[in-house]
């Protein structure tokens, strides 16, 4: 269900660190990056309506269900997640794969991002697959933070109310009326970009 984060990840982070904590401060090529030298969280910035700030609403990884030896987490807004003590998780991007680390340094891997489905995470005693699918896109002019892309696209994310008993607003990828989850009403979704917010040391 949980895997211990290898020290090599942190060694890599130190090796790659260049004194900057956000991509907008980098003087390197603006090409998307598959590895970041810092831990971060995600926030969803509405791209269709004005926002109260330049980061958007904070996102969390919440427990969806467990099976023997494994746990599934799902990405939703902090405000809609009913269990506020659950999960204090920081994220890492290494080689195009996303990892979530809890306060005990156990980790979860982001599952394959599929059109019409929510952004999920898996932890397993048997190890969970790492999927090379994510990149960090440099902050656009006028924005402070980089954005997260999947399969090279950072404009296909949406926040959708699921309509389930908990009433969570979850992150979906490239959702449409043709491929939506049965509990999601697509017209109630709105487009967002996922902002990468560095975690202070």
Per-region residue spans from a language model:
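Short non-domain terminal segments
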Residues: 1, 7-8, 13, 38, ...
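Fungal secretory targeting signals
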Residues: 1-30
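Short linear sequence elements within intrinsically disordered, low-complexity coil regions
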Residues: 14-15, 20, 92, 139, ...
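Extracellular glycan/ECM-engagement signal in secreted proteins
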Residues: 25-64, 116-201
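Short, well-structured hydrophobic secondary-structure segments
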Residues: 62-116
